[in-house]
């Protein structure tokens, strides 16, 4: 009887330990889930926590292109659609709930400039044509922007081929970003590290 009681107590302790471990794992998963492409998913809270440790760089693909959609154009046919502008505005509001302090940049195309403008709702925007050139030199260009921003967080509106290049080069994964998808990087000791894919919420 005593042996049975001891085994029962041990089993209860094991189950309690197992349940606690599952709760911890679930909590971690909610903060850092994994995308099907192999990149960690970083939500707003996780991004804010990362930004407390290092300057973060968030690179967004522009909103829906007018010239590749049947939806109504915002204005210029080389820019974004009305739907794209509204999506960018909603995303910007959600983003700013967690990250208020950042400098804003875009490449020199109408679609990225419009996307950044609607995302930020009045924040000052700096246009940099180097954000259109996406090869090995992209990292030096980003570091230059970080220095100009005095190591503040920065948001960059760029293009799908830039995000695809960075994901492949830094993590060896295939990333085919949709409109307004984004990658999160951070700067540490002059080096850039790819942390994952930004997922609002």
Curated annotation (Swiss-Prot):
Keywords assigned: Hydrolase, Periplasm, Signal
Pfam families: His_Phos_1
Gene Ontology molecular function: phosphatase activity
Subcellular location: Periplasm
Keyword Ion transport carried by entry: no
GO CC annotation terms, alphabetical: periplasmic space
GO biological process: lipopolysaccharide metabolic process
InterPro entries named in the record: His_Pase_superF_clade-1 (IPR013078), His_PPase_superfam (IPR029033), LipoPS_heptP_Pase (IPR011310)
Pathway the protein contributes to: Bacterial outer membrane biogenesis; lipopolysaccharide metabolism
Entry's family note: Belongs to the phosphoglycerate mutase family. Ais subfamily.
Cited HAMAP family: Ais
Function statement: Catalyzes the dephosphorylation of heptose(II) of the outer membrane lipopolysaccharide core.
Protein name (Swiss-Prot/TrEMBL): Lipopolysaccharide core heptose(II)-phosphate phosphatase
């Amino acid at each position: 009887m005593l042996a049975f009681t001891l085994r029962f107590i041990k089993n209860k302790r094991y189950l309690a330990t197992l349940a606690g471990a599952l709760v911890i794992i679930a909590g971690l998963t909610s903060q850092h889930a994994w995308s099907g492409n192999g990149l960690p998913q970083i939500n707003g809270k996780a991004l804010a926590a990362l930004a407390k440790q290092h300057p973060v760089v968030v690179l967004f693909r522009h909103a829906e292109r007018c010239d590749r959609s049947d939806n109504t154009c915002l204005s210029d046919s080389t820019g974004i659609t009305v739907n794209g502008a509204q999506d960018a505005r909603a995303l910007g509001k959600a983003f700013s709930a967690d990250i208020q302090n950042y400098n804003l940049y875009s490449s020199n195309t109408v679609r990225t400039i419009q996307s950044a403008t609607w995302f930020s709702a009045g924040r000052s925007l700096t246009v940099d044509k180097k954000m259109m050139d996406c090869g090995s030199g992209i990292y030096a260009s980003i570091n230059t922007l970080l220095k100009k921003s005095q190591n503040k967080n920065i948001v960059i509106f760029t293009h799908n081929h830039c995000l695809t290049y960075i994901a492949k080069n830094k993590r060896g994964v295939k990333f085919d970003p949709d409109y307004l998808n984004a990658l999160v990087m951070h700067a540490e000791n002059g080096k850039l590290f790819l942390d994952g894919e930004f997922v609002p919420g």
